């Protein structure tokens, strides 16, 4: 089952400095945050190319229970990757519902 979160939940993870891996395949969101929150987001960022996500998670021995948040432009690519990660045994995978486009909309409404 695909776990979806929105701006409010992502913002809580960042502002609350909750540990998670952030795989951003979309536009940058660092500029939305103050320096302290930005530092947490930078530490959470798992920089990789889309085709290298699985090999890099495996190579870095990322535990299957690690919280992983995926963001892309519209949520489509992230959803496909999340399904693949879940098939491989990752149990704590989240997709930004609607991707960057929806994230911007929800942020403006907050």
What are these regions (language model features)?
Residues 1-20, 25-67, 73-110:
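Rhodanese-like catalytic fold shared by cysteine-dependent sulfurtransferases
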């Amino acid at each position: 089952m695909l776990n979806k979160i929105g701006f409010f939940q992502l913002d809580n993870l960042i502002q609350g400095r909750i540990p998670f891996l952030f795989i951003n395949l979309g536009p940058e969101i660092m500029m939305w945050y103050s320096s302290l929150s930005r530092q947490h987001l930078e530490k959470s960022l798992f920089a990789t190319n889309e085709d290298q996500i699985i090999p890099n998670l495996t190579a870095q021995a990322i535990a299957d229970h690690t919280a992983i948040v995926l963001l892309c432009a519209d949520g489509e690519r992230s959803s496909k990757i999340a399904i693949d990660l879940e098939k491989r045994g990752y149990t704590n995978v989240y997709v930004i519902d609607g991707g960057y486009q929806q994230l911007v909309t929800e942020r403006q409404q907050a």
